[in-house]
A protein has these predicted regions:
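Substrate-gating cap/lid alpha-helix
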Residues: 65, 184-216, 228
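Single conserved hydrophobic/aromatic residue that forms the stacking wall/gate
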Residues: 1-11
Length: 376
């Protein structure tokens, strides 16, 4: 179908890491493409389905500039000056400045810098700075795998997200530039880094004018799930609701708000109720189906010893109440905090999945200890 039907036009930037910021891109290196069967194979499927949903609802064409680069950590996309002004990130800048790249991985929140593209600001300089201050309506972001793999420390990722969003808003001269991102999906049981990184992404929502598409229910053995439709369309709910006046649209699934201890139980409150909570299931790219006779899964509680135990969970009105016979004095609760939780089934009635969460970040493992083999 042509862009007159889908309403989508695309533009991809050339790949080349540069140390100083590029100020212009040669005309022959970049051009808008009308959506067609021939142009889609080389373009981001998530971006396409995002743009198509927005265009279909607004009735106007939507253009997307793709500035992605697969398999790269977030550091390369952040303006280098943002590292200098943030306490949590300054050690990275100092080591890179002194050409001690191998030592970056040993830092709290460290990352393996495999090539120059992973150095602070390098991808930003070549693929973001040349576009600014183009009058973009917002940004969508799908990344995190390369900050949560073997040898990477996902702690501090939320501070990197803050630096990313703030830096882009500065260069686009828009302090309220909407920024929507994808939370990492389900992947592998041993992917402890992904557990912590998903939580870091959830905590990044403290930034104003941001939104997160939850994908924990889109299980796939591939690091990049084949179901791009749900990812893109869930992202599209955010601008439709927050920017384009579709206030009746629910833009996200249930997000952890607070937890209250009541004797041997914990009562959990959520934002983004979307008409109420429900137990449901989703098979592949099919619709979400309510399953009221099924128990809620993947809730766990812990006492002061920080040992997690499976918990029974029940929906009571707009809250979830959890308890476990193994924990008489609970202090923390978590949901879907595994590398690949099978059938996480808490949704709102808009058909959107609840985000994984942990009420106490100190209790959440982030890697396998190389000495003991346990988690840390």
């Amino acid at each position: 179908r042509s862009s007159l039907v889908t309403g989508v036009q695309t533009c991809a930037l050339p790949i080349c890491p540069d140390s100083p910021s590029l100020r212009d891109i040669k005309r022959h290196e970049i051009a808008w493409s009308v959506d067609s069967q021939s142009t889609r194979p080389g373009y981001s499927a998530v971006a396409f389905f995002f743009a198509r949903k927005v265009a279909n609802h607004l009735g106007v064409p939507v253009g997307v500039i793709e500035s992605s680069w697969g398999g790269k950590p977030i550091e390369g996309f952040i303006p280098s000056e943002e590292f200098e002004t943030r306490e949590a990130l300054r050690p990275i800048a100092e080591l890179v400045r002194n050409n001690k790249l191998k030592e970056v991985g040993a830092l709290e929140g460290g990352v393996i810098i495999r090539n120059t593209a992973g150095m602070p600001g390098r991808i930003f300089n070549s693929r973001i700075a040349p576009v600014a201050p183009y009058a973009v309506a917002g940004a969508i972001w799908y990344q995190g795998e390369s900050n949560a793999g073997k040898g990477e420390d996902p702690r501090n990722y939320r501070f990197k997200m803050q630096a990313l969003v703030t830096g882009w808003r500065k260069v686009f001269r828009n302090p309220k530039l909407p920024f929507y991102f994808v939370q990492l999906p389900s992947y592998r049981d041993e992917a402890f880094g992904w557990i912590r990184l998903r939580e870091e992404q959830r905590l990044s929502l403290s930034l104003p004018q941001t939104g997160m598409a939850v994908t924990i229910d889109l299980y796939d053995t591939d690091i990049h799930p084949a179901n791009k439709i749900d990812v893109g369309e869930r992202l599209a709910l955010w601008p439709l609701s927050q920017q384009y006046g579709h206030s009746q649209r629910v833009c996200g699934g249930p997000l952890f708000k607070s937890a209250k201890v009541e004797g041997e139980t914990m009562r959990i409150q959520f934002d983004f109720l979307g008409g109420g909570l429900m137990v449901a299931t989703k098979e592949g790219a099919g619709p979400v189906t309510e399953t009221p006779a099924t128990d809620l899964q993947h809730f766990e509680i812990a006492g002061a010893d920080a040992v997690w135990h499976p918990a029974t969970a029940e929906i009571e009105s707009e809250e979830v109440v959890v308890q476990s016979p193994s924990v008489s004095r609970p202090v923390a609760v978590r949901y879907a905090c595994h590398g690949a939780p099978q059938n996480p089934n808490l949704y709102n009635r808009a058909g959107l999945p609840a985000s994984p969460f942990c009420s106490n970040l100190a209790f959440l493992p982030w890697s396998v200890d190389p000495v003991s083999g346990g988690t840390r």
